[in-house]
């Protein structure tokens, strides 16, 4: 029998120390990685429940194990809530991550050697959309689309390539693209060439849930997403689909790709979806957009260039070449000043992928901890202060002190 009073710090002090150190880092650093956020205590509590003990292969009401009547309730709540959020016909909440969700779509509709079309990783796409080293690039013939000279999606070139290559599947979505995506335009092209239209909305899902970024669900055959990032849930994936595709997608997830679903994570997804249905979630997402605009405008005023000239979402790419610093160097020096970002290639980047000429900045996490316009402006100026003198240790120390004072005023978990 387990004793609930015996906790991690007693049974595994090494792991407890690592957890405590990571908690301190999250509280002390300004989190600016666009794909990261802070899950609520309720979401984290759901992940720590006894639901982790339950095997539940199959779907609610159709399990291969007994004793699933209560985990069925949790999964059905997650399904119903995510359908309500996005207006979807059907939903699968079992994918372990966004990549698994994307792979399930490929398994449902494609055969090895089929042609797919996705956004080039070098111009803002995601590695699961056809990158050469990813299974999507190894198993399928990939035709990529990219940006025009204004650094906006080149819809005309995309349409032309689609008619030339006749892909079986067209993917819209990105991991480093700051503007709105015209899902209706993609849908028309897909229909014209007879392709399945898939949207990976992982980065934009929270904004879409709040109704402040275009919703792809009315236009796409299938929509995949992560449940963390801007949606602010646990780490995991979902697939939304037209009713006629539900059987194929469900079979692709189980038994096609996965066995037992993670019922504790699915319960946490349900909690996050309920949070996303509340009025305050829209207020939060509106502030995410405002903070991103303020950060972008402030960085421009300090001599930095924003790829595409602006942001219309939570994310932006920053061209660092005017500061004579690489993305790799900027990531390290900003980290030492307690601001966490990630290096990121910019379009036509002359540097290697592990070096880069840019960084990606996002505002979901800073907004969760309570930052508004003024704090966003302060943060952007602190970023610029570091980039103006990245090798001056006194400058880094001064910025770090200001960051620590700011994060102390706005604790994540109190």
Curated annotation (Swiss-Prot):
Main location, first listed in the record: cytoplasm
Q: Which PROSITE patterns does the record associate with it?
A: SHMT
Any one Gene Ontology biological process term? tetrahydrofolate interconversion
Keyword Cytoplasm attached: yes
Modification N6-(pyridoxal phosphate)lysine, positions: 229
Q: Name the pathway it acts in.
A: One-carbon metabolism; tetrahydrofolate interconversion; Amino-acid biosynthesis; glycine biosynthesis; glycine from L-serine: step 1/1
Q: Which amino acid positions bind (6S)-5,6,7,8-tetrahydrofolate, per UniProt?
A: 121, 125-127
Please indicate which residues carry the site annotation Plays an important role in substrate specificity. Answer: 228
Q: Which GO terms describe its molecular function?
A: glycine hydroxymethyltransferase activity; pyridoxal phosphate binding
Q: Where in the cell is it found?
A: Cytoplasm
Domain of life, per UniProt, equals Bacteria
- UniProt-listed InterPro entries: PyrdxlP-dep_Trfase, PyrdxlP-dep_Trfase_major, PyrdxlP-dep_Trfase_small, Ser_HO-MeTrfase, Ser_HO-MeTrfase-like, Ser_HO-MeTrfase_PLP_BS, SHMT-like_dom
Q: Which reaction does it catalyse?
A: (6R)-5,10-methylene-5,6,7,8-tetrahydrofolate + glycine + H2O = (6S)-5,6,7,8-tetrahydrofolate + L-serine
Q: Name one GO cellular component term.
A: cytosol
Keywords, in A-Z order: Amino-acid biosynthesis, Cytoplasm, One-carbon metabolism, Pyridoxal phosphate, Transferase
EC number(s) stated in the UniProt entry for this protein: 2.1.2.1
**Cofactor (UniProt):** pyridoxal 5'-phosphate
How is the quaternary structure described? Homodimer.
Describe the task this protein carries out: Catalyzes the reversible interconversion of serine and glycine with tetrahydrofolate (THF) serving as the one-carbon carrier. This reaction serves as the major source of one-carbon groups required for the biosynthesis of purines, thymidylate, methionine, and other important biomolecules. Also exhibits THF-independent aldolase activity toward beta-hydroxyamino acids, producing glycine and aldehydes, via a retro-aldol mechanism.
Q: Which family does it belong to?
A: Belongs to the SHMT family.
Kindly provide the name given to this protein in its UniProt entry: Serine hydroxymethyltransferase
